[in-house]
Amino acid sequence: MEGGSEHTKDPGGEGGDGESLAARPSKIKASSGPPTPPEPGELESEPEEEEEEEEEEEEEASQGGTAADEQAKVPKELTAAEAAGEEGPGEPGRPAKPQPEPEEPAEAGAEEPVQPKSGAGPEELDAEARAEELEQAAEGKEVRSQASLPLTRIGEEEAAAAPEAETERVEGEEEDEEETRRDGAESEGRAGEGRPAKSQEEGKPLGGRDEFEDLEWSEEVQKLQEQQLRSDLLDQYRSLLMERNRSQRYNLYLQHKIFEALRKKKGLEAAEVPDRGAQAEAPEKEQAYLRHLGMLEDLKKQQADDLQWYHQELGQLKQQCQEKLSRVEKEWRRFQALKKQVVMQAMGSCRMRGGRQAALREVEQILALEDKKEKEMSAVRLENVQLKQSLVHFETRMRTQEDLTQGLLLIDFEQLKIENQTFNEKIEERNEELLKLRNKVTNSVQVITHMKEKLHFMDTENACKKKQLAEIEAQVAQGRDILTKTKQAREGLRTDNIRLNQKCGLLGNDSLLRDLEEKVDKTQLLHQRLESLKRHHAGLTLSCRGVRQKIREAKAFLPS
C-alpha cells in the first residue's frame, strides 16, 4: 500500500530519464598526468559554491523529504577524504585495489630526496592536522593559503589503501542516503494517503480485478526501472567521488612539492649559491603550472555544467514525484471506496441488526479510525525524517569539532548507524508484514462471506435432495411389492401354460397341424390307390384263372 501504490506511473517517463542519465557520459576524464594545485583565490571560491549548494539543498529539504541525501553530501565526502587520509598502510581490511600513483614531476624528483615509507612519527600527525585544516577551509569556515602549509609526502602504501576504505565508507553512506530518501518518500506518500475525505465513501465502483493486475504489473516495471536508474547514478557518484578524492590528495602532494621547491629556492638565494639548473627548469615548471591551472579551470566548468544538468534532472524528478503523489492519492481514494464497498457487502451478507444504516455507521467508524492511524503514522514518519536531517546536521557540526579522537568517535558512530539501519530495516519489515496481514484479513473476510453463502446454499440443496430421496425410496418399496406380486402371477401363468400345452397337443402349432393334414391326405390317397390296386389285382387274378381254365380245357382236348 505504501511502497507499491506510490509508483503507479507508466514506465515510459522514468525509463527515458533513466536512459538519459545512464547514457550521458561523464565529461570528467581521469587525466594521465598529475593535475595542478589550485590557486588560493580558487580555493576561496570553492567553499562559497559549496555553501550556496548547501543553502539550495536546505530549501529543497523544506519542500520535501527527498533532499536529505544532498544535505549530507559534502560532509560525507569530506569525512571519506579524512578517513582516506588517516588510514595507514597497516590498517586491517580487504586488500586495496591497485591505484595508479601520481607521477612526480621530474624537477621535484630531482630536488627532493626520497623519504622512507614508514617511521614518519610526528610528521604523519602534522600531515593529518594540516589535512583537517584544509577540509575546514573547503567548508567555508577557514580560508587559508595552501601554498604555505608544510605537508609531508603521502606514502605510496597509504595512497593505495585509501581508495578501498573510502569506497567502503561511501557504500555505507549511500545506504544511509537511500534509507533517508525512502523514509521521506514514505512520509509524503502517507501524508497524501491520509487526505481522502469521507465524501468519497459512496464513490463509483472500480473497473475490476484487471485494473489492479495492470497496476501491479506497472508498479513492478517501475520498481525495476528505478532500481536500475539508482544503481547507474550510484556508480557514477562513486566514480566521481573517488576521482575527486584522488585529485585532492594529489593536489596536496603538489602543493607540498611547490612549498619545498620555494623553500629551497629561498635558501639558495640567501646563501648566494647560484642554481643554473633550477633557473633553466623554472620556465618549464611555470608552463606546467599554468597548463595544470587551465586544466583545473576546465574541470571546474565541466563540474558547473554537470551540476546545472543534475539540477534540471532533479526538477524533472520532483515533477514526476508530484504526479506520482497525485496518482497515489487518487488510487488511495479508489481503494478506500472499494474497501468500504467490500465491507458493506460483507456486513450485508452477515445480516447485522439495525440494517444498512447501522452497517454504514460501523464502516464509517472503522474507516475514520484507520484514517486517524494513518495520519499519526505519517506524522511520526515525518518527524523521523526531520530527526534524521537534524542528526545529519549535527553530525556535520561534530565532524568539524573533532580532533585526534575522531577515529574512536567514528567507530562509535558507525556502530550506532548500523544499529539505526537495522532498526529501520526492522520497521520496514514490520510495515510490510502489517500490509500483508491487512491484505490477508481482507481476503479472509471475502472468503468467509463466500463460504457462508455457499454453505447456506448447500444446506437448502441437501434438504431438497433428502426429500427427493424419501420419495424415491417410497416409490422403490412400492415397486418392489408390485414386482413380487408380478413374479407370483408369472409363476401361476407359467404352470397354467404348461398344463394347457400338455392338454391342447398340437393346438396352436400351425406347422405341425399343416403337416398332419398333409400326411392324412397322403394316407387317404394311398388307401384309395391301395383299394384300386387291390381291385385291379383281383381282376387280374380272375382273368388269370380264366386263362388257366381255358388252357386246361385246351390241354384236355389235345391228344396226348
From Swiss-Prot:
Descriptive protein name: Cilia- and flagella-associated protein 184
GO process annotations (BP): cilium assembly
Top-level taxon of the source organism: Eukaryota
Function of the molecule: In complex with CFAP263, acts as a regulator of ciliary beating that connects radial spoke 3 (RS3) to the inner dynein arm (IDA) and the nexin-dynein regulatory complex (N-DRC). The complex is positioned parallel to N-DRC and forms a connection between the arch at the base of RS3, the IDA tail and N-DRC.
Protein family (similarity comment): Belongs to the CFAP184 family.
Subunit structure: Forms a complex with CFAP263; the interaction is required for functional activity in cilia.
Record has Coiled coil as a keyword: yes
Compositional bias per record (Acidic residues), positions renumbered to this chain: 41-61, 101-110
Stretch list, region Disordered: 1-209
Biased composition (Basic and acidic residues): 1-12, 127-144, 179-209
Coiled coil spans: 357-481, 510-536
Cellular component terms per the entry's GO annotation: axoneme; centrosome; ciliary basal body
One Pfam family from the record: CCDC113_CCDC96_CC
Keywords: Cell projection, Coiled coil, Cytoplasm, Cytoskeleton
Origin species: Macaca fascicularis (Crab-eating macaque)
Keyword Cytoplasm applies: yes
